[in-house]
Regions:
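Acidic, serine/threonine- and proline-rich low-complexity intrinsically disordered segments
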Residues: 1-44, 65-172
């Protein structure tokens, strides 16, 4: 395992590209601290490790979409931490430095009475992209429908009169 990790790190720093970039160095040291802005114009970021952090006003980073967070603190009782030290990054850097955190999964969910199927690419807790799936895995589809019926009830189904009569007799 250590040999694989050493080889991966060596590949990422070969050559001049990124070797002296502070964001790249921080991202290699702490890949779980790569952070993406949660909404346009927001000072709130989500780190790959799942922690939300806030960039203080006047930080001098010019409102970047991505940061490599070197130091963050969180006060007791607060849900978000504060960024104390960070370097401006981008998605390309994040993908290179934290390639082990990249995952692509198919998700099929029951949402408001409908089945939603999508392919989601993530860097840790950060969603990079979502694309609809036309033909989801039948097992995932079945599980989503079962969850939907369990939460919404059998009233969602259209029952023929004979089936309704049978259910009423069985309920007796």
């Amino acid at each position: 395992r250590w040999r694989r990790e050493a080889e991966r790190l060596a590949r990422t720093v070969d050559g001049p590209d990124g070797a002296d970039d502070p964001a790249y160095i921080v991202a290699l040291a702490y890949p779980e601290r790569l952070a993406r802005r949660r909404a346009p114009g927001s000072a709130s970021y989500l780190m790959a490790g799942g922690t939300a952090v806030t960039l203080p006003p006047g930080s001098g980073t010019a409102d970047p979409e991505w940061l490599a967070v070197g130091v963050a603190t969180r006060d007791p009782g607060r849900s978000e931490g504060y960024i104390r030290l960070a370097a401006v990054a981008d998605e390309r850097l994040a993908r290179r430095a934290a390639s082990d955190l990249l995952t692509t999964t198919d998700e099929v969910e029951w949402v408001d009475g409908d089945v939603v199927a999508r392919r989601v690419e993530r860097l840790g807790a950060i969603t990079l992209s979502e694309k609809p799936i036309r033909d989801p895995d039948p097992d995932l589809l079945g599980a989503a429908v079962r969850r939907g019926l369990a939460s919404s009830g059998l009233g969602l189904l259209s029952w023929p009169a004979e089936a309704t009569a049978l259910r009423q007799r069985l309920d007796f």
